[in-house]
Amino acid sequence: APQPAVPVSFKPRPPLSQVSPKLIAKELLTPKQFRCFDKLMQKESNWNSKAKNPSSTARGIGQLLEPTYRNLGMRHSKHGVTQVVAALAYIGRKYGSSGPCGAWKHWQKHKWY
């Protein structure tokens, strides 16, 4: 006979608007991939959701360009969690299974990802 399902317990959690973008990334990634993503976001914006590149349309935590947001089917958001989701979507499409560590390796060589 099949085993009964293990009950799932949920912790009460704050709305995403009240959660740190860095914490969301940490929850979504393996520890190794998070370390790479953290280094990358520190270099790109120091995790500043209001960061703007003076020489391009890149802005936010991931410093994504406007065309990149459009290619992802997204719009730039002032909200850091949305910016992290967009950066992770971009990294997933561009670097595949190498993920944030692939993006970080590329950044170290070229100073962009």
Describe the function of each predicted region:
Residues 12-113:
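Peptidoglycan cell-wall recognition and remodeling modules
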